[in-house]
């Protein structure tokens, strides 16, 4: 079945302006694959589910031992199928606030406790360069970043420019439909960046997270407290984050119960329930300790489904 026939079945807007007229993603000789499947190139960005790591850089491999969220770093996360990352941008200290001092650190810089970069400093430039290298060697994957930001926008622009990531960012206009994954790949705009800071017209590529998307509450202490309710944002946008991690009584990520909430059957049931309740599939499923449980397998299953009520495919 050719691309044009597929699009006639899927409705207007399927064939974006970036598709060469004769390109058929289902024809192996055309050589375009998106997230491992040619047909996913036809999916719009908001009609796909991406596995996401919370505080992606806060790992033992990155020498973060206090307030860590995962055991393994970016390389392992990428190889495990993670394609969306939550990052916290800070300056190195309250005195070291130049553009070269931008780091990924976990914590509140206004805390009366230690500055977060004292106990969890990760080189943001090196981290993003590695991500860019991984993306360059991938086969049609779109990546998303959600920044909890504590530095000026101009410092982020330098960071993304010097690491080569600014050249590949996609800019979304609020209220406009999201493009297909294939369009984004072919157009070289395979990176979407959100930040939880207010909109700044100087940086249209830094999408205000809670204007362009929304999320569920996060950091509950009990699994029974997890819900599909709106946490931040309006609950109307088709792009949304299903936050799926528990916090300990001290407010840190809970490694003991991560495997419980990331369990395949448990997480799949929650995702399908929220899909039904919300009306849109979760765009992102965000977890702590991604190594425990099967978040990537859950997203593989969800992406094989066109509706929450459909037949659930076999376990990957």
Regions found by a protein language model. Give the residues of each.
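Secretory targeting signatures
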Residues: 1-22
């Amino acid at each position: 079945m050719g691309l044009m026939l597929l699009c006639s079945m899927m409705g207007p807007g399927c064939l974006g302006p970036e598709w060469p007229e004769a390109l058929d993603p289902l024809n192996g000789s055309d050589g375009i694959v998106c997230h491992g499947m040619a047909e996913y190139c036809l999916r719009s960005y908001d009609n796909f589910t991406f596995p996401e790591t919370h505080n992606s850089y806060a790992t033992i491999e990155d020498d973060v031992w206090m307030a860590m969220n995962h055991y393994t770093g970016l390389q392992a996360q990428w190889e495990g199928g993670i394609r969306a990352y939550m990052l916290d941008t800070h300056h190195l200290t309250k005195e070291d606030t130049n553009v070269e001092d931008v780091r990924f650190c976990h914590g509140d810089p206004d805390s009366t406790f230690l500055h977060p970069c004292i106990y969890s400093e990760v080189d943001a430039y090196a981290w993003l360069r590695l991500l860019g290298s991984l993306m360059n060697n991938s086969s049609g994957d779109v990546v998303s970043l959600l920044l909890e930001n504590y530095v000026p926008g101009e410092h982020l622009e330098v960071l993304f420019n010097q690491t080569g990531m600014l050249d590949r960012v996609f800019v979304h206009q609020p209220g406009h439909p999201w493009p297909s994954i294939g369009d984004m790949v072919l157009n070289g705009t395979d990176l979407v960046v959100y930040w939880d800071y207010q909109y700044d017209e100087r940086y249209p590529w830094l999408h205000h997270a809670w204007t362009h998307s929304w999320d569920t509450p996060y950091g509950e202490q009990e699994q029974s407290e997890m819900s599909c309710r709106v946490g931040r944002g309006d609950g109307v946008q088709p792009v949304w984050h299903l936050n799926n991690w528990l916090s300990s009584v001290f407010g840190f990520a809970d490694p003991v119960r991560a495997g419980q909430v990331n369990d395949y059957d448990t997480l799949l049931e929650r995702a399908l329930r929220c899909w039904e309740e919300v009306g849109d599939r979760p765009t992102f499923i965000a977890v702590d300790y991604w190594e425990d449980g099967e978040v990537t397998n859950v997203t593989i299953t969800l992406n094989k489904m066109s509706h929450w009520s459909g037949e659930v495919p076999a376990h990957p």
